[in-house]
Design a protein with these regions (language model features):
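Short, flexible coil/turn micro-motifs enriched in small/turn-prone residues
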Residues: 2, 21-23, 82
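Beta-strand elements within well-structured catalytic alpha/beta cores of enzymes
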Residues: 18-30, 120, 188
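Surface-exposed loop and adjacent secondary-structure segments within mature catalytic domains
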Residues: 33-112, 117-239
């Protein structure tokens, strides 16, 4: 069959050592979503749709995984992405920490889990995070951050108890991941307001300002620490920084 022939081609191409590892994750991409996509693409090609195969359905191997949190049978993206990046199931809302309580910062400080991105970074490999969501959102954040509560995206989200116990907001953690190596060399996504202060007006939308109340402009801090780096706020700006 065509799919089997393509599978043989993939196997032949997989000989040798891999150059890159890319995890492509469709957040919320359930079986029904995949089925709808398969049918829609097939109909766009002029068929009835059911006979169509999406690109990854031609791979030589596919598998299913059971998704759940330690405290919920219907999971959220924070706990499930933590399971993907660390291999450990955890409570709903948790990012990069083992199971505990969403409100207990002090307890979570001893439950941090290493992600495969951090392991790769510590081995000297180049790493990066690309997302259509905010970089501080649960799914991308689970590659680099450690927090019992997914909603602690900037300093205004943390409770006073969490601040006193020593927890850091997720945006701040993106800048402090260098303890495992260099940290992500590429971070593309939304949510720049989580990194800027309420005194800073958005560079693209004049009616918006940052969200931080601690007076820290994390963007400026990163630029000062990495003068050789590039910060882009749009596609055009990004293309201007291409090397």
């Amino acid at each position: 069959s065509t799919s089997r022939g393509l599978g043989d081609v993939y196997k032949r191409q997989m000989s040798g050592k891999a150059k890159n590892v890319i995890l492509f994750l469709g957040d919320g991409m359930s079986l029904t979503t995949v089925a709808a996509s398969r049918i829609y693409e097939g109909q766009q090609k002029g068929g009835s749709g059911e006979e169509n195969l999406l690109s990854w359905e031609r791979f030589p191997a596919t598998a299913f995984s059971k998704t759940y949190n330690t405290d919920s049978q219907t999971p959220d993206s924070a706990g499930t992405m933590t399971a993907i990046t660390t291999g450990v199931k955890t409570h709903m809302g948790a990012i990069g920490v083992s199971a505990g309580s969403r409100t207990d910062c002090a307890d979570s400080l001893s439950k941090g889990l290493l992600t495969w991105l951090q392991l790769a970074d510590s081995a000297g490999l180049a790493t990066g995070v690309v997302s259509t969501a905010r970089l501080t959102h649960a799914t991308p954040a689970a590659t680099y951050a450690h927090s019992p509560e997914r909603n602690w995206e900037n300093d205004t989200d943390l409770t006073e108890a969490a601040k006193a116990a020593g927890c850091k907001d997720i945006a701040q953690q993106l800048l402090s991941t260098s303890r495992y190596g260099r940290g992500p060399l590429v971070a593309l996504g939304g949510g720049r307001g989580e990194f800027t202060t309420v005194e800073e007006r958005d560079p693209e939308y004049d009616d918006k300002v940052g969200q931080r109340l601690d007076g820290r402009s994390l963007v400026q801090e990163w630029q000062q620490a990495h003068p050789q780096g590039a910060y882009a706020v749009s596609y055009t700006h990004l293309r201007a920084h291409e090397t």
